[in-house]
Amino acid sequence: MSLFKIRMPETVAEGTRLALRAFSLVVAVDEHGGIGDGRSIPWNVPEDMKFFRDLTTKLRGKNVKPSPAKRNAVVMGRKTWDSIPPKFRPLPGRLNVVLSSTLTTQHLLDGLPDEEKRNLHADSIVAVNGGLEQALRLLASPNYTPSIETVYCIGGGSVYAEALRPPCVHLLQAIYRTTIRASESSCSVFFRVPESGTEAAAGIEWQRETISEELTSANGNETKYYFEKLIPRNREEEQYLSLVDRIIREGNVKHDRTGVGTLSIFGAQMRFSLRNNRLPLLTTKRVFWRGVCEELLWFLRGETYAKKLSDKGVHIWDDNGSRAFLDSRGLTEYEEMDLGPVYGFQWRHFGAAYTHHDANYDGQGVDQIKAIVETLKTNPDDRRMLFTAWNPSALPRMALPPCHLLAQFYVSNGELSCMLYQRSCDMGLGVPFNIASYALLTILIAKATGLRPGELVHTLGDAHVYSNHVEPCNEQLKRVPRAFPYLVFRREREFLEDYEEGDMEVIDYAPYPPISMKMAV
């Protein structure tokens, strides 16, 4: 019933509206950083052209072909557009965004060779009256975020220069640089990545993720070249990796209820910014975002029946909701997949007597989430805005006692921050999930109260790595963390509990492949 739901404010969309779209940059330089003379490229390396085409065209999904429904965008200056031979305009399979203070989209279409091509590519060319910032603002709008997977800045010199300055540089997720060993340099336009610690670096430290061996072109001149990828240092994900590394090196050997055994330390903390739509979804291993989102929304509705998750393909509770596991806990009267008064029930009905998952608990117990939302609206400086899932009297009735059990909210300068306390922290499987889950919770509570998301502070009690996770965690530690993605909302709802996973989308998430780790039960 709506009487017991949390109504969203009329300004619900304002606090989480994306301002600028994240992007990557593709450039070819000589050994001195030269990119050309402002009119043409002073070398011919077909392998680099193929790399450029493949990178800017290919989508992340397996065997997914570009279409107007999903494709990448390439942003270029007017001179770069003019340097493309007319028969190759627009660059196929991509949205071509051309920066020009004089030309309109129609002017660019009129410049195509024939009417058939103009009709064919009417939705593949966009002119922007302004610079890169204006293009990124356009591509962050709801008209483009659903259909554009990755934005690439492809030059020329002035556009590259803007890419390396604030505000654009803070959205720059990767630099793909090809270095050409040219016989002589005739360049008058240059691209150089600012050195860390200088004013020009704008607080960003660039790290090399990959570099190829030196290659030889088949262009007839045996030109030498190599590829490299630079990414901004992600100090927030490094907190997580450093903690995992410390636990593996220094952790205490502990025995646990699963019989697997752990390496463990006691007491740690990590901090993650949620500002400007950034979502701390770890990149060194793909995090199951759909599972994160479905479970968190399930919590917010006060649900306890895990079959509702498994029916949506989210099987994270299947083992702990199995008949055998429930019976081992003495919960023989529960229907299979009924987890008892776990997380969401305590969030929304703390203290109510639990019978079974499909009973009506409206108005029963303390609705901690609703109370926090009301307090945030009326007294945001209150120091009692916290909720707990740890109810000692109800623990025997739960399939599992809560691991993440306490959260407190804090408001400063119109921003909402959350501190999570987690008693038991499975660093390999659980913690990446928990970080994303409480980030989403904070974002949704901020939306419900007209605030902007601020920071997630994650405090860990028993932080451990299971013995069978040490090897896969060591594999993960070899990876250089990439930039975090962003969260955008496709649809707003009248009530907080009515949000669905499809109402939101994670964009610009380019993690490394998954690493298999078996859950300890």
Curated annotation (Swiss-Prot):
NADP(+) binds at residues 28, 34-40, 78-80, 99-102, 155-162. Residues 22-232 form the DHFR domain. Keywords: Methyltransferase, Multifunctional enzyme, NADP, Nucleotide biosynthesis, One-carbon metabolism, Oxidoreductase, Transferase. The active site is at 403. InterPro entries: DHFR-like_dom_sf, DHFR-TS, DHFR_CS, DHFR_dom, Thymidate_synth/dCMP_Mease, Thymidate_synth/dCMP_Mease_dom, Thymidate_synth/dCMP_Mease_sf, Thymidylate_synthase. GO terms for molecular function: dihydrofolate reductase activity; thymidylate synthase activity. GO terms for cellular component: cytosol; mitochondrion. Residues 237-521 are annotated as: Thymidylate synthase. One of its GO terms (biological process) is methylation. It comes from the Eukaryota. Pfam families: DHFR_1, Thymidylat_synt. It catalyses: (6S)-5,6,7,8-tetrahydrofolate + NADP(+) = 7,8-dihydrofolate + NADPH + H(+); dUMP + (6R)-5,10-methylene-5,6,7,8-tetrahydrofolate = 7,8-dihydrofolate + dTMP. DUMP binds at residues 257, 404, 422-426, 434, 464-466. Pathway: Cofactor biosynthesis; tetrahydrofolate biosynthesis; 5,6,7,8-tetrahydrofolate from 7,8-dihydrofolate: step 1/1. Homodimer. Bifunctional enzyme. Involved in de novo dTMP biosynthesis. Key enzyme in folate metabolism. Catalyzes an essential reaction for de novo glycine and purine synthesis, DNA precursor synthesis, and for the conversion of dUMP to dTMP. In the N-terminal section; belongs to the dihydrofolate reductase family. In the C-terminal section; belongs to the thymidylate synthase family. This is Bifunctional dihydrofolate reductase-thymidylate synthase. It comes from Trypanosoma cruzi.
